[in-house]
UniProtKB/Swiss-Prot annotation:
The gene is mdh. One of its GO terms (biological process) is malate metabolic process. It holds the Pfam family Ldh_1_N. This is Malate dehydrogenase. PANTHER family: MALATE AND LACTATE DEHYDROGENASE (PTHR11540), MALATE DEHYDROGENASE, MITOCHONDRIAL (PTHR11540:SF16). The active site is at H177.
Amino acid sequence: MKVAVLGAAGGIGQALALLLKNRLPAGSELSLYDIAPVTPGVAVDLSHIPTDVKVKGFCGEDPSPALVGADVVLISAGVARKPGMDRSDLFNINAGIVKNLVEKCAASCPKALIGIITNPVNTTVAIAAEVLKKAGVYDKRRLFGVTTLDVIRAETFVAEAKGLNVDKVRVNVIGGHSGVTILPLLSQIEGASFTADEVAAMTKRIQNAGTEVVEAKAGGGSATLSMGQAACRFGLSLIKGLQGEANVIECAYVEGDGKHATFFAQPILLGKNGVETVLDYGKLSAFEQEAMDGMLATLKADIQLGVEFVK
């Protein structure tokens, strides 16, 4: 398996690359690209870790050499949030970066599974889809917005609040990947019950967890280490699916059946073509249904912004 990380010199990219070097299947190839000249050095640094994963680093304007033959591409390139910024402030810079990188993916590895980490994910995934459509290589089963960070945060916070074994907690998080569009389905968690106040507070904490990190880092960055872990979990799940492993399920922001919006985060079964099946997320509580109804206009507007950017 060949995995390419685009944006590999950044905070998320380096954390993700370190985790993948340690956790990819033996015999895999890890291809690192960033515009920054330090990137080949990041690859050399990682190459000293004794695992059977070969690492190569590429820098400069053109990511194509890093992409040829890639099975999975994870894109974390772009600028990070700073205090006072929301994810939409990132759009002006990151939209162009994602567009350019996905154009190169379309040319160099059109069959690869592409996971978009770069925020605002609600919009950057729509940009990626439009770029792939223009190139004539769009396959909705092969494009993902990586929302796993919302899932691992939900699992962590719920386990802490309820004194549960975090390894056993599973939380589906649906909708999108910013603010009110993040909807953790707390009503469905096995072995945990919440009061109405707890649901409201926990939902808000999960939605605002990114801001919690940005503020705690006091201008020194955003969530890089936890995002690296989340992206690694999702990337490894993509690979398990490609290798034919059964019952690999994750939540991700994908083009599903369009019931709510063109793109929607929901549980999916992964397989040899990426998304094998979009799974039903089950029955919503009254609180969750109200939150869903309240977020859809925001989500649809985020998606439309991406579509119009490429047009």
